[in-house]
């Protein structure tokens, strides 16, 4: 059960990094791009978060500005820090920055603490954890600052009986019921990505094996108990 991991004493981050495999998406997109250039395929449909439908918002120091879940209370720190971008005068070299700032939006999260929109690989479509695109440094490593481009995650409770009362996210048991239910949802996610041309058929084999690997871990054997 990969999401139930501890952080080593020498680790910089306060939380474990996100285990969210996405390399197959790049191969599928490059394959489509190559075919489009050759005139044998059309571009894939766009899929990105939008302000209009609430899947993007302007973040603040309040973690609930992006999510209804109070992740810091559950153990996943949040600083509200994100990259900013100034309006620059590009008519000269070097360019001259101004004090005007672009509005930066971030994806909003669903009831499980994951991005509502965008292309979802199996780890995101059939999640075992809340995945964050940031990572906060722990004590001894400039505590509270962002840890570069690192990610983080906070696992769901495996069984409902073991849930933290403050955790509003569904447990793995509530989401999938049994190991077979999890694998069925996982494989359906893989098949949909292949049908949408967001995963190559060759990669689908490896990703279905990844689902088996997840479900074969020791703690997963207690799912539904």
Located regions from the model:
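C-terminal His-loop and adjacent cap/lid subdomain of alpha/beta-hydrolase
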Residues: 1-225
């Amino acid at each position: 059960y990969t999401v139930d991991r501890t952080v080593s004493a020498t680790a910089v981050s306060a939380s474990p990094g996100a285990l969210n495999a996405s390399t197959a998406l790049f191969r599928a997109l490059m394959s489509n791009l190559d075919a489009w250039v050759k005139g044998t395929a059309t571009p894939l449909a766009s899929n990105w978060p939008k302000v209009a439908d609430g899947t993007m918002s302007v973040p603040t120091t309040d973690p609930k500005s992006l999510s209804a879940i109070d992740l810091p209370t559950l153990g996943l720190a949040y600083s509200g820090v994100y990259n900013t971008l100034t309006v620059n005068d590009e008519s000269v070299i070097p360019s001259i920055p101004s004090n005007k700032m672009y509005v930066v939006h971030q994806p909003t999260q669903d009831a499980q603490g994951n991005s509502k929109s965008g292309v979802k690989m199996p780890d995101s479509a059939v999640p075992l954890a809340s995945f964050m695109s940031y990572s906060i440094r722990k004590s001894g490593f400039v505590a509270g600052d962002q840890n570069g481009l690192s990610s983080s995650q906070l696992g769901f409770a495996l069984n409902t009986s073991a849930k933290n009362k403050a955790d509003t996210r569904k447990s793995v048991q509530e989401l999938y019921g049994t190991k077979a239910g999890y694998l069925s949802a996982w494989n359906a996610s893989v098949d949909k990505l292949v049908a949408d041309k967001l995963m190559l058929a060759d990669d689908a084999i490896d990703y279905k094996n990844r689902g088996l690997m997840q479900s074969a871990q020791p703690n997963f054997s207690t799912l539904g108990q």
